Every structure is written in structure tokens, then in C-alpha cells.
């Protein structure tokens, strides 16, 4: 949620910045609502002052047993009018609040203009693409030939966009999650956290998935007469651990990681990547979350992105780092880097991680603040998150980049001894 002060006092400037995200702010509507709110607030405050004066006089007369019936009637009427005004004001404030929930975060000044991936800025390339002397297979064909990716069984028991993994590919999938968690906890300093896979609607409002992306979520409607949603990412439960809290500055930065399944309906991606591990309804991911002071958040974004990059570097997978343009960015983000890994079968880079600084956007929705050491007032924290990494896509990238002409797949060296029980090849 944006700072209400900006919407009240810098509406034109904010509207212009939001155009970078392809969002047209209805200035006339928000100005009209704010004008009504101010007028109603003044009216309510004035009546409250008069009511308080009458109440004090009534208490004084009651004490000396000289009650004035006119005063009593006036006080009763004042109380009724004040109650009606407060209800009207609350309804208007709720309307403004709901409207504010539909407004995305403001993009950082260094975010490129543009509405498509062609306008993204390539920051760097890493790794050398392998040259093949044979016809390159995609990861679906490789998995089928190895008889370890079972699409027929998953379609039978669940439907499209699900997968059953078997044998050493299933072992590799597990190995990747363990490797990523070890790297982020032991080397990068994150605290491993186990979180629920079902969350309430308040949590999804807090991190910004609701109300805008309700169609992309899997909703569970009948547990203890409460509504739950399967998590689309561990960002939701990890970040909401600190909702409605005031943290001490000494607690910051907070760095958390979790390995969870993620569930997405992919309603907005209908028809895209219907084949393979790229876009499933259920997939696993290791998530990175940081909560930090505002002045440190942009440096923290660089660090968090580096932590995700390190996974790709140690697996020796060629990738590129991309700064997203305004039109490609997520709803809650102020700045986002995508890491895109090379897929030789497609001869292009595909997203494997998205690392974002959310500034105070989520913190305002969650009411997460921190107490500065020498200041009386509390400030909103900044939140960051990123994939470190998406496990299914990492697995697919390994199958393609490490394939041999005879159909076998070499296991990345860093995984062989510690995580893959000494296995060097899948064949």
C-alpha cells in the first residue's frame, strides 16, 4: 500500500510514476473521495468537540442534581448524530482503503521504461554456453527416455500441469532443495523456517496477492468455516510472520529461507508453457526473504540477488541477470531483477528467479514497523524476497545443459558426493 500522504499531497507526481507500470491512476476519483473525507472529518471533529462539552456540562449538573431536560435531549440528539457521522466516515475510509489496495507500488527511478521483455535491461551474462555435436533434446524428451518423468500418471491422478518424478530424477529434485538450503543457511546467513502451506486472506492482502490476483490462487473454502488459500510462494507466510508487529532496530536485518511447494492456477498464463516443468500448478521453490531498514534495502536487493546467482554459479549453469522494465514488474515491487537460465533446446534464456525490493509497500499493508534507537516514532520496514531457486526449473535446466549424446545426464559436480549418494550420471 502506498503512503497515504503521497496520494493526498503528490497525486499528480505519483500518477505519472505509476504510468511506468502501465497503471492509470484515477485522479478524479481519489481526489473526490479525499475531498469528501476531509469535509466529513472536520464535521465529525467539530461535532465531537461540541458533544464532549455537552457531556462535561451534563456530568457537572448531574453531580449537583440540577439536570436540565433540554440539555439531556440535546446530548441524546448529539450522541445520535455523532454516531451516524462516524459510521459514514468509517464507510468512506473503508472505500478509500479498498481503492488504495488496487494501486501498485511505485517503480524506482532507475527502472527502465517499457511494457515488454524487450525493454528489460540486461545487466550481465555469466557462464559459457555448451556447444553440442548432436541434436539437443528438451527436458521432457530426456525425462521420458529415462522413464523418470511420468506425465501420464500425473494426468491420471490430478490433471494437466502436474508431474510425477521417479528414481534418480526424484533424488536430484530433493538434492537440489537440500543444496540450496545448505548454501543459504550456512554460507549466506539465512534462518531456515518451516511454514504452513495454507494461509488466510489477511496474509495474502498483506503481501499484495489479494485482491488483484485472486484468480491465480487455489482457494480452500471449508475448513472450520474459514477461508484458506494454498500458498503461491513462501514469500506469503515468511513475510507475514511479522505482520502487526513493532520490531527493534537491533533485530534487523531479518533473513529467512524456506523450501515449500507452491500452488498457482496459472489462469493469467493460459496456453503458455503447457509442456514440461516450466509452468506447473504445483512446484517446489526455495524462497529468500529479508526485512530491513529503508536506507539499506537497495543494497540488500543486490545482496539477495547475488545469493540466488550463487546457486546457478555453483551448479555451473549459464544465466543472465536482467533489470525488469516497469511494465514487466510485479504489483508490489519497486525494483526487480530476474535471473534467466539458458535452455539449449529453446535457444533462449528463461526466468528461474525473480528478486524484488518491495520498499515499505507490504509493510504498510501488514502494519510492520520498527523502533529506531534514538527516535520516539516508529518507521515502516522494507521487505525483499526472491527465489533461491525454483527447483523444478533448475532441474529442467540441468537435464538440458548436462545431457550427453547417449541420453544420459551428468550430475553437477557439487551435488554428486554430498547430495546424490555418489551418483555421477542419470541413465
Swiss-Prot record:
Protein's UniProt keywords contain Protein biosynthesis: yes
Membership in a protein family: Belongs to the class-II aminoacyl-tRNA synthetase family. Type-1 seryl-tRNA synthetase subfamily.
Enzyme Commission no: 6.1.1.11
Main location: cytoplasm
CC per GO annotation: cytoplasm
Keywords: Aminoacyl-tRNA synthetase, ATP-binding, Cytoplasm, Ligase, Nucleotide-binding, Protein biosynthesis
Catalytic reaction annotation: tRNA(Ser) + L-serine + ATP = L-seryl-tRNA(Ser) + AMP + diphosphate + H(+); tRNA(Sec) + L-serine + ATP = L-seryl-tRNA(Sec) + AMP + diphosphate + H(+)
InterPro entries: aa-tRNA-synt_IIb (IPR002314), aa-tRNA-synth_II (IPR006195), aa-tRNA-synth_II/BPL/LPL (IPR045864), Ser-tRNA-ligase_type_1 (IPR002317), Ser-tRNA-synth_1_N (IPR015866), SerRS_1_N_sf (IPR042103), SerRS_core (IPR033729), tRNA-bd_arm (IPR010978)
One Gene Ontology term from the biological process aspect of the record: selenocysteine biosynthetic process
Function: Catalyzes the attachment of serine to tRNA(Ser). Is also able to aminoacylate tRNA(Sec) with serine, to form the misacylated tRNA L-seryl-tRNA(Sec), which will be further converted into selenocysteinyl-tRNA(Sec).
The species this protein was found in: Buchnera aphidicola subsp. Schizaphis graminum (strain Sg)
Protein residues bound to L-serine: 233-235, 287, 387
Protein's pathway: Aminoacyl-tRNA biosynthesis; selenocysteinyl-tRNA(Sec) biosynthesis; L-seryl-tRNA(Sec) from L-serine and tRNA(Sec): step 1/1
Record lineage: Bacteria, Pseudomonadati, Pseudomonadota, Gammaproteobacteria, Enterobacterales
Cellular location(s): Cytoplasm
Entry-linked PROSITE patterns: AA_TRNA_LIGASE_II (PS50862)
Coiled coil (UniProt feature): none
UniProt subunit comment: Homodimer. The tRNA molecule binds across the dimer.
GO molecular function terms listed in the Swiss-Prot or TrEMBL record: ATP binding; serine-tRNA ligase activity
Protein name (database record): Serine--tRNA ligase
Binding annotation for ATP: 264-266, 351-354
The keyword Iron is annotated on this UniProt entry: no
Domain description: Consists of two distinct domains, a catalytic core and a N-terminal extension that is involved in tRNA binding.
